[in-house]
Each structure stands twice: as C-alpha cells, then as structure tokens.
C-alpha cells in the first residue's frame, strides 16, 4: 500500500472514495474528485476509478467517452450489470433524441440489436427478455414439474437463477397465461374444423338455390302482358289438357285433337295462335 506521490492517498483509498461517492449519488462531487487525481497510469487503470469515470460520463451526457471506457477495459463479472445498464441507457437516450420520441419495447429491442454489448462488459451468454438462457432453462425445467411454485420455492429459484423473487413470480405467471391462450386457440381451431366438416357434407347448390329463390322473390319486376302470356303458355305446355284462362281480346284456343303425346306440335300450334292474338291486340 503505497501513497501516491503529491496526492496523499493510496490507490485503495482512492478506490474507496469513488465507491462511496457513487453509492451516495454525489456524482458532481465524484466528478471533481476524479478531475483532481494525479496523472498516474496505474491509478487511472484501477477498476473502481474506471467505473466512476463511466458513471460520471453518463451523468454528464458524454456518451462517446462512456463508450470508450466500456470498450477499452475488461471489467469484472460483478460489475457487468451496472456497466451494461450504462451502455444500453446511453444508446436509448441517443436514439430517442434522434427520433424525437420515447422508445417502446420494439424500439429498445432494435437498439440492442444494432449496438450489442461489448465483450468487455458481457460474458458472451445470450440473454432473452433480460434473463440469461441459463436462468430460463432452470425455470422451464421447474415449470414442467410444477407450474405453481410455493413462495419458498420461488425464493430458492431466485437464488439459483440470480433473479429476484418478483421476476421469478412474473415469469411463471406469464408462462401460464401463454399456455392457457395457446390451449384456447387449439380448442377454437378444433371446433371450427368440426363445423367446417359438417358444412362440407351439404350440397354446394343448397346455398345457391336458397339465394336465387330469395333474390327472385324479393327483386322480381312487375310482369308485363307479354310475360304473362309466356307464363300462360308454359302452364299449358306442362298440362296440355288443362283449359287456358280467357284473356280479353283473345279467342278460344284451337282444339288439340290428335296432338296429344307430341309436345313439339303442341308448342308450335300454341305459339302460332298466341302470336296471331298478340298481333290482333297491337293493331
């Protein structure tokens, strides 16, 4: 433990002052203290001093200096969470200033993808939704055996994963909700498939027939005299023996002796008679 020349403090004492000022939130005073340190490479490479410099740089909005510090020194694992927080928050602030609006969850995700954590403050293990994959594996394994852990089990899981009890509780709650939603969707799809199978057994013409009949009933235009005559003709053709209804101006229909059983001859005779009658009406 050697006293730094022309300063009066040891390196350990300087590191202790940096830690105390950080924990107390006295960042302006911490900045002045760092500025007063002598130009000693050994001192300025101390991890507590570098961490204090990073905190002050973020506090003052000097993000370029912050990134330089975080990328140039291999920080200890126990300091990774704090340094990662500074890295991400700084990039979030820059992105919000550039876009002119706060970032949502998707925006923050894109920033993290664009500016991944440097290996100096990251152990290289993939994280998902802020949980390390190792922690998620422990939670998934427990969930398969018991989706409803007791408070004591949640505390034990929190210790095993490095998470808080609240984080563990929220993870199980969200997982149960996702599973229930997936089961409900599967049931809905199964019911829809069953209904579709029953409908497919019906004739595809059933719906068309009902649609055509309803459309004809609702939208039929008023019948003209010519249309009425055609309907009369059709009825006579369907039942040649039935007498035709008398129409004003029309004579009695011609007898059809000897023509039964010959639809084409009956049709030609009726058409000729009807045409003559219509011509007489028009004259």
Swiss-Prot record:
MF GO annotations: DNA-binding transcription factor activity, RNA polymerase II-specific; RNA polymerase II cis-regulatory region sequence-specific DNA binding
Disulfides per UniProt: none
CDD domains the UniProt entry points to: homeodomain
Matching SMART domains: HOX
Matches recorded under InterPro entries: HD, Homeobox_CS, Homeodomain-like_sf, KN_HD, SIX1_SD
Binding region for DNA: 124-183
One record GO biological process: regulation of skeletal muscle cell proliferation
Observed phenotype of the null mutant: Morpholino knockdown of the protein disrupts both skeletal muscle development in the trunk and cranial muscle development. Disrupts myogenesis by interfering with the proliferation of dermomyotomal cells expressing pax7.
CC per GO annotation: cytoplasm; nucleus; transcription regulator complex
Low complexity bias: start-end ranges: 237-248
Subcellular location: Nucleus; Cytoplasm
UniProtKB keywords: Activator, Apoptosis, Cytoplasm, Developmental protein, DNA-binding, Homeobox, Nucleus, Repressor, Transcription, Transcription regulation
Chief location of this protein within or outside the cell: nucleus
Domain of life, per lineage: Eukaryota
Biased composition (Basic and acidic residues): 179-190
Region (Disordered): 168-264
Family that this chain belongs to: Belongs to the SIX/Sine oculis homeobox family.
Protein purpose: Transcription factor that is involved in the regulation of cell proliferation, apoptosis and embryonic development. Depending on context, functions as a transcriptional repressor or activator. Plays an important role in the development of the inner ear, where it promotes hair cell proliferation and inhibits proliferation of neural progenitor cells. Required for normal myogenesis. Plays a role in the development of fast muscle fibers throughout the body, as well as the development of craniofacial muscles.
Protein name, entry field: Homeobox protein six1a
Lineage: Eukaryota, Metazoa, Chordata, Craniata, Vertebrata
